A protein has these predicted regions:
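A short, proline-enriched helix->beta-strand linker immediately N-terminal to the Walker B motif
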Residues: 160-164
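ABC ATPase NBD coupling module
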Residues: 19, 73-93
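Conserved ABC ATPase signature
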Residues: 141-145, 149-151
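Short coil-to-helix segment of the ABC ATPase nucleotide-binding domain corresponding to the Q-loop/switch region
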Residues: 105-112
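Conserved ABC transporter NBD signature motif
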Residues: 64-75
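Helix-to-loop junction immediately C-terminal to a conserved catalytic motif
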Residues: 56
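Catalytic Walker B motif of ABC-type/P-loop ATPase nucleotide-binding domains
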Residues: 166-169
């Protein structure tokens, strides 16, 4: 097994409520290598989304250190926002519960744009949609397809950027059981084929059981 794509050491995050500081994450450490998947579970408010936001630089650390693909970030550090933005552009793919497609672009053009921004203009963007089962909808717009089809396109968009790490925050949370299972099948199959690392935040224990490792935030604070 190679070096971790993602390594977290002593991560802490909290917020002020009234006159008190409430701890959300405390002294958390973890690592995920290429080809591995980690499920993050826990009760509502346990910090699942907060953790994923920290892992891609959308929130700042109170304490600790995060390293992604060799880039290291501490609670304080000059130029962190610029470095995080570059990682999100080229290295970290993020899949949200709410589909993050541009409504004015077709599914195919959404994938092409994401691939271009990551510097991976390979011409294989349509193939990614086909691999995710929405090749026939490639020229349709997000509001012309079902929620499940749009989420598949969002997953295709992330894989097209050839990320080292994928962060998926409740990617099937808004879908019915059948569609959720289909999207999850696609996500895990392609993740294993490409060998990227995956961190999946979910309340769905069945989905979490498909990952290599489990982190239950309900027991960490």
């Amino acid at each position: 097994m190679g070096s971790p794509v993602l390594a977290v050491e002593g991560l802490s995050k909290g917020y002020i409520s009234g006159r008190q500081r409430v701890s959300v994450l405390a002294d958390l450490s973890l690592s995920v290598c290429s080809g591995e998947s980690l499920a993050v579970v826990g009760r509502s408010g346990s910090g699942k989304s907060t953790l994923l936001n920290l892992l891609c630089g959308l929130q700042t650390l109170d304490d600790g250190r995060i390293a992604v693909a060799g880039e290291s970030f501490a609670a304080t550090g000059a130029g962190a926002e610029v470095r995080w933005a570059e990682l999100r552009r080229r290295t970290i793919g993020v899949v949200f519960q709410d589909v993050n497609l541009m409504p004015a672009l077709s599914l195919l053009d959404n994938v092409r744009l994401r691939s271009h921004l990551a510097g991976h203009d390979t011409g294989g963007e349509r193939e990614w949609l086909e691999r995710l089962g929405v090749g026939a909808e490639a020229d349709r717009y997000p509001d012309q397809v079902s929620g499940g089809q749009a989420q598949r396109a969002a997953v295709a968009m992330v894989f097209a950027m050839a990320p080292a790490l994928i962060l998926a925050d409740e990617p099937t949370g808004s879908l019915d059981r059948h569609t959720a299972d289909e999207v999850a099948d696609c996500l895990f199959t392609v993740q294993q084929q490409t060998g990227c690392a995956l961190v999946l935040a979910t309340h769905d224990r069945e989905l979490a059981s498909r990952c290599d490792h489990l982190l239950d935030l309900s027991t960490t604070v």
